[in-house]
Curated annotation (Swiss-Prot):
Domain of life: Bacteria
NCBIfam families noted in UniProt: tigrfam_recA
Positions that bind ATP: G65, P66, E67, S68, S69, G70, K71, T72
Source organism phylogeny: Bacteria, Bacillati, Bacillota, Bacilli, Lactobacillales
Organism encoding this protein: Lactiplantibacillus plantarum (strain ATCC BAA-793 / NCIMB 8826 / WCFS1)
Region of interest (Disordered), residue spans: 329-380
Annotated Basic and acidic residues bias: 340-350
GO biological process: DNA recombination; DNA repair; SOS response
Any single GO CC term annotated in Swiss-Prot or TrEMBL for this entry: cytosol
Name by which UniProt lists this protein: Protein RecA
Length: 380
């Protein structure tokens, strides 16, 4: 009886592979991927809070919070990290608010950044789908979900009711995107705003626009909020920002990270290194003084940060000790089979797009409307 069941199962598996291709179904133990492949967020503290050393490839991440809390800054740091590793990044700027000068200060190579400023929500999501399907994009940022306005709303009159239109649009788009993202190992970062529910007496009245689909499809959801201002004398030079991992499917959720976002500079690497090194006693804190080895590096946190900024060799040494202490060098490694699968998906996407380009007319595709930021004149 057991042999008959096994034979029937083997027949079914062969039939599935014949109809849908090799790899359509397999036993989990046969998969060679044992670790989650990640891209660093650009912040050591956030990488630690995420639990796997960064954003997982092939997944959807939502970053939401109040206005001017640092959501775009967090996303741009991820873009910079992808580009440092030789990857390709795309940015769907639905808010038409991306500052290329600020992005460049954060380490983004604006000449290679693919930028699209769509007219409607449908156009923006079609462009996103075309870019992800190509298999040649490593990270895609959509800024923001709230600004993806449906075509019917744009073409309609002010005051017209369009109940649930954006939610249906997002639900349909995410159904298509989620599978493609997993195959091409592309990270999709969706930036979102917050709204308040009317008439809520108990519980949190805050919610995010775009319906519930993004909440379900997102592997990671990050809540970004300003905690306090950073001052130098009477001048405000930045904000202390708290990032809470509200949802995490690849590691324990509800961890928090605190980072300094300095105006014009982005996330302060030295600030988080001081905090994390002090937590692991790599840098000793006695009263208000910070010391490393036999040397005092500053009285107060800001002076310790200045010392590390002025001594990059010391900062590099401490950073490596912090990474070792938090076990970050051991996470996010890819197996060779995973590399091959991602490469195969990219090659298939490129070949598919190439053949389409030869057979079709010169009509522009949605992906062709996404331009290199370097192709546009930038005022500095």
């Amino acid at each position: 009886m057991a042999d008959a069941r096994k034979a029937a199962l083997d027949t079914a598996l062969k039939k599935i592979e014949k109809n849908f291709g090799k790899g359509a179904i397999m036993r989990m133990g046969d998969a060679a991927q044992t670790t989650i492949s990640t891209i660093s967020s650009g912040s050591l503290a956030l990488d630690d809070a995420l639990g796997v050393g960064g954003y997982p490839r092939g997944r959807i991440v939502e970053i939401y919070g109040p206005e001017s809390s640092g959501k775009t800054t967090v996303a741009l740091h991820a873009v910079a990290e992808v580009q440092k590793q030789g990857g390709t990044a795309a940015y769907i700027d639905a808010e038409n608010a991306l500052d290329p000068v600020y992005a460049e200060h954060l380490g983004v190579n604006i000449d290679d950044l693919l930028l699209s400023q769509p007219d409607t929500g449908e156009q923006g999501l079609e462009i996103a789908d075309a870019l992800v399907s190509s298999g040649a994009v490593d990270i895609l940022v959509v800024d923001s979900v709230a600004a993806l306005v449906p075509r019917a709303e744009i073409e309609g009159e002010m005051g017209d009711a369009h109940v649930g239109l954006q939610a249906r649009l997002m639900s349909q788009a995410l159904r298509k995107l989620s599978g493609t993202l997993n195959k091409t190992k592309t990270i999709a970062l969706f930036i979102n705003q917050i709204r308040e529910k009317v008439g809520v007496m108990f519980g949190n009245p805050e919610t995010t626009p775009g319906g519930r689909a993004l909440k379900f499809y997102a592997t990671i959801r990050l809540e970004v909020r300003r905690a306090e201002q950073i001052k130098e004398g009477t001048n405000i030079i930045g904000n202390r920002v708290r990032i809470k991992v509200v949802k995490n499917k690849v590691a324990p959720p509800f961890k928090r990270a605190e980072v300094d976002i300095m105006y014009g500079q982005g996330i302060s690497q030295t600030g988080e290194i001081v905090d994390m090194a002090a937590e692991k006693d790599i840098v000793k804190k006695s009263g208000s003084w910070y010391s490393y080895g036999d040397d005092r590096i500053g009285q107060g946190r800001e002076n310790a940060k200045k010392y590390l900024d002025e001594h990059p060799d010391v900062m590099t040494e401490i950073r490596q000790k912090v990474r070792d202490a938090y076990g970050m060098d051991a996470t996010g490694e890819e197996t060779s089979e995973t590399d091959d699968q991602a490469k195969e998906a990219k090659d298939k996407g490129t070949a598919k797009n190439g053949s389409k380009g030869q057979s079709k007319s010169t009509k522009a595709t949605p992906a062709e409307t996404a331009l290199d930021l370097g192709d546009q004149p930038t005022e500095k």
